[in-house]
Amino acid sequence: MRSVISRKFIKYPEVGHPVSVGIQRRGMQKNIMEFKIEKKLKGALGRAGILKTPHGEIHTPAFVAVGTKATIKSLNPEQVKDAGVEVVLGNTYHLYLQPGDEIVRDGGGIGKFMNWKGPTMTDSGGFQVFSLGAAYGKDISKITKVTTDPSLLIPERFDDSDAPRLAKIGQDGVSFKSHLDGSIHYITPEKSIQIQHNLGADIIFAFDECTSPTEDLKYQEEALERTHRWAERSLAEHKRLAGADTFPQSLGPSLRSATPSEKHAASANPALFGIVQGGRDERLRKESAKAISAMDFDGFGIGGSFAKEDMSTAVRWVNEILPEEKPLHLLGIGEPEDLFMGIENGVDLFDCVLPTRLGRNGTIYTKTGKIIIMNTKFRNDFSPIEKDCECYTCKNYSRAYVAHLFHGKEMLAGTLASIHNLYFIVNLVKNIRQSILDDNFFEFKDEFLKGYLHF
């Protein structure tokens, strides 16, 4: 018999009477976000909902495609949309360095700049700054122990260009060298929020310190105190910037000549999510969840590094404390088994680079596990990658053709594999969402993972 786990702070009505929570602060232009719970998962913390943003709805739980530099690598926006993606996440660190947040601002914000017409998010840039590693001589990855598949040894939110560089942590912020030209930069919570407001996403994140799981308890405690102070400062700067009720005339010519509706969309106030840290320590994780939930954030992110076998426990520690009326994002996690775990424990949003990164390197998701398309056995396999898959790749090309492209080092290879992988993960989450609505989540989970993990 499954034990029933409930969150604190609020009790929802029975199924059939969804709760809608609109978020609006004094001085802000309009409701910036609305989160409606459609149905809760019996016996666990999971739920299906709808997150409304100024640029469209996100049906949660949902997978967020990572467009690090305002692009999903090897795909155009139409291909991303056709894969079922509803929301894209850009990286503040990379867009600040290139092309520069003011250029993105002058181009109409990240959505218009990259021609993505749906909801957008930006992270704070903190993970990339701290994952440079030199600040404490250790690398950071999202999961500290993974399977033996070599393709998974790449940290999930660690861009290829994030080679170790100099980074120095202070109480007020972090200084680091640009990986592009060696120039020195200093990021504070206020600076991160200013950059993200320029980038113009619908949902942004507070600046936090992402620690290495190998750090001792004393340092984890110090870093957590810093993260909480930075959260308060991020929130204060966000409120200051979002309090303006007039369109900023300092913006570039493309926005000054925009229609009123375009200006309204571009200047809509973003929702700000606070990030829970605390490493692998239960006391620190719970302490952080209490501290961050006491602040006036619109939603929450769970950050930091996890041991794969401990991830479910750590997520549950946090979610049993956070208020359930606000959306929750698990940062940098996106493997199929982890998606089921997160959703069961109340996570609404996930982001991860793996679908496209693995695709570009010839590793492809299927319901029976990953395949390496360049293996010899696929050279004469004229079946689609997945027989019942409705993605563009599977409807038009064979395994043999995709394998041929990879062996020939053709650019189309990574595109076709990425289309399939993104479709696979996005639609897996959509099917999980539907299983919550249909009251068969646990049956669907057991059936899928039995085939995928072969247990």
Where are these regions (language model features)?
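Intrinsic disorder/low-complexity segments
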Residues: M1-K30, K239-N269
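Non-catalytic, usually N-terminal nucleic-acid engagement modules in DNA/RNA processing proteins
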Residues: N31-A242, T376-R379
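C-terminal extensions of enzymes
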Residues: N31-I50, I58-G67, T71-S74, D208-T214, ...
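Conserved, mostly hydrophobic/aromatic
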Residues: G56, V88, D123, Q196, ...
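Short, well-ordered coil/turn segments that N-cap beta-strands
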Residues: V85-E86, W116-T120, G200-D202, A268-L272, ...
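Alpha-helical packing segments of well-folded alpha/beta enzyme cores
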Residues: S192, A223, T227-W230, S234, ...
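Glycine- and acidic
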Residues: S212-L217, E221, D298-G303, M411-G414
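Glycine-rich phosphate/ribose-binding loops and adjacent secondary-structure elements
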Residues: E225-H228, E237, L241, A271-I385
